[in-house]
Amino acid sequence: MIKIIIGYVLDLIIGDPNNPYHPIRYIGKLASNMEKLWRKVFKKNLKIAGFFAWLFIVFITFGVTLGIVHIANKINPILGTVVSGILIYFCISAKGLKVEGLKVIKILKEGDIVKARKQLSYIVGRDTENLDEEAIVRAVVETVAENMSDGIIAPLFFAGIGGAPLAFLYKAVNTCDSMFGYKNEKYKDFGFFSAKLDDVFNYIPARLTAYLIVISSFILRLNCKNIFKIYKRDRYNHSSPNSAHPEAAVAGALGIRLGGANYYFGKLVEKPTIGDAKKKIEISDVYKTNNILGMVSFLGMVVALIIRCILEVII
């Protein structure tokens, strides 16, 4: 249990360390190497190539993490707990998510919209060159809302079930989707299993995140009446079966509209809207979303501890 608290507190204090030695970056390097290898092995069947790449990436990551934790526990149980806590910390990005969004808003408030667009491009996939202030703020809110699941709640959820090794396994799944889960010509076959299996792994965390956003909205005295209506109506308004769940909850809590049309690689992509435009999206909505994020991450840690307690009693 203490290892989950260590991971949560370290993220709360330090945040996401932006350096080339971050363990998650090594998963990315492993993924690149596995892609090259399995594309050569199965040149004529890229779906199979992608599946084997996914399998090796995920289980190598899990095995290495399990080995590190096992060795640390063998040396000293306290060391094992500390190492596990640090590894869990590397899987959580609550503070990093908040900080990156606020960087965009700080620049925007200074009046440099060109620089704000550039900063936004580091955290979103859409084209940002022509976005106005409202579109920039909307993009930040959407990014924070969507990533509450895969950046915070999902790692904590899997850490609660299986400690650092399972949290890292999840991050490997998520990394595969981030790198391969595109519908373009290069990855539509190779990334097929990465995208589908990411949906499977995020099924429970995405819905759990939405429920925690609802609870957080009650605690923070936001629009609790509207949140149920919007969540029930719009939770599937996305090409992903999971992404709209936290976004719909946030949109309902703030009384704003998210989603809609965006440009990706120069092409206009029409997406369903999420929420009702009861008011214009403002910079203050980013701060409110960050308040929700803080409460959700705390509640997520509590849920992970409860899961761990239940499993320890059962097992």
Curated annotation (Swiss-Prot):
GO terms for biological process: cobalamin biosynthetic process. Keywords: Cell membrane, Cobalamin biosynthesis, Membrane, Transmembrane, Transmembrane helix. The chain crosses the membrane at residues 48-68, 77-97, 150-170, 200-220, 295-315. It is found in: Cell membrane. GO terms for molecular function: ABC-type vitamin B12 transporter activity; threonine-phosphate decarboxylase activity. Converts cobyric acid to cobinamide by the addition of aminopropanol on the F carboxylic group. Belongs to the CobD/CbiB family. NCBIfam families: cobal_cbiB (TIGR00380). This is Cobalamin biosynthesis protein CobD. The lineage of its organism: Bacteria, Bacillati, Bacillota, Clostridia, Eubacteriales.
